[in-house]
UniProtKB/Swiss-Prot annotation:
EC numbers: 2.7.1.24
Protein function: Catalyzes the phosphorylation of the 3'-hydroxyl group of dephosphocoenzyme A to form coenzyme A.
PROSITE patterns to which the protein is assigned, alphabetical: DPCK
Primary enzyme class: transferase
The family this protein is said to belong to: Belongs to the CoaE family.
Binding positions (ATP): 11-16
Keywords attached to this entry: ATP-binding, Coenzyme A biosynthesis, Cytoplasm, Kinase, Nucleotide-binding, Transferase
Organism field: Ehrlichia chaffeensis (strain ATCC CRL-10679 / Arkansas)
Pathway stated in the Swiss-Prot or TrEMBL entry: Cofactor biosynthesis; coenzyme A biosynthesis; CoA from (R)-pantothenate: step 5/5
Encoding gene (name): coaE
Protein name: Dephospho-CoA kinase
Domain (DPCK): residue spans on this chain: 3-202
Length: 202
């Protein structure tokens, strides 16, 4: 089994790249954002965790994500502590996901994790792919999601720089051009690794 980790800033196109891996090469994708959403919606221990740190963000047992988002943008020491605990839960989910698909003899796993490098989610990766685009397109994608320019800049400020991500990456994919160009870059990566030695997951 080969494990790819995607690293890139918000709006860089990581989910797009992950979807192409899934479609073209039948890769399974660990979507950390989706996992977090499920935890907030259904996991009582996580809901309790949110209530412990931010009681104003839980109403009748339901996490108010808009309220919680404001705590994220405040980025206090309390948030950092909460985030560290939450990340340990997500990391355990990721490990279980990888072990399950290893038993299923899955060929390719893609980790779509926003803070792959920053939170040490990359240790099981055989290859790290740096996903990047130009800043204008990156900002347009984020604004389309409903975030403000100020929120976009706040997120960028806490993420690794492009240069730091490159230091960890084996490959780079640029998503600012056409879909066909992105597909070509992915196919080139797959051709490259197919001529290397076999890799084992952790």
């Amino acid at each position: 089994m080969v494990i790819f980790g995607l690293t890139g800033g918000i709006g860089s196109g990581k989910s797009l790249v992950a979807s192409y891996f899934k479609t073209l090469f039948k890769a399974v994708v660990f979507d950390a954002d989706q996992v977090v959403c499920q935890l907030y919606n259904c996991d009582n221990s996580v809901i309790k965790l949110v209530k412990t740190y931010f009681p104003d963000s839980v109403d009748h047992g339901v996490v108010n994500k808009n309220s919680l988002r404001q705590h994220f943008f405040a980025y206090s020491n309390l948030w950092v502590e909460f985030q560290s605990t939450l990340h340990s839960i997500i990391l355990e989910k990721q490990k279980n996901f990888i072990m399950f698909h290893n038993r299923q003899s899955t060929k390719y796993v893609v980790l779509d994790v926003p803070l792959l490098i920053e939170s040490n989610f990359y240790s099981c990766c055989n290859f790290i792919i740096h996903v990047t685009t130009n800043r204008l397109l990156q900002m347009q994608r984020v604004l389309y999601r409903g975030l403000s320019i100020r929120e976009f800049e706040s997120i960028i400020a806490i993420q690794l720089s492009e240069n730091d991500r490159k230091k960890f990456a084996n490959f780079t994919i640029r998503t600012g051009l056409s879909k066909g160009d992105v597909l070509f870059q992915i196919q080139k990566i797959m051709f490259d690794i197919s001529h290397r030695s076999k890799y084992l997951s952790c």
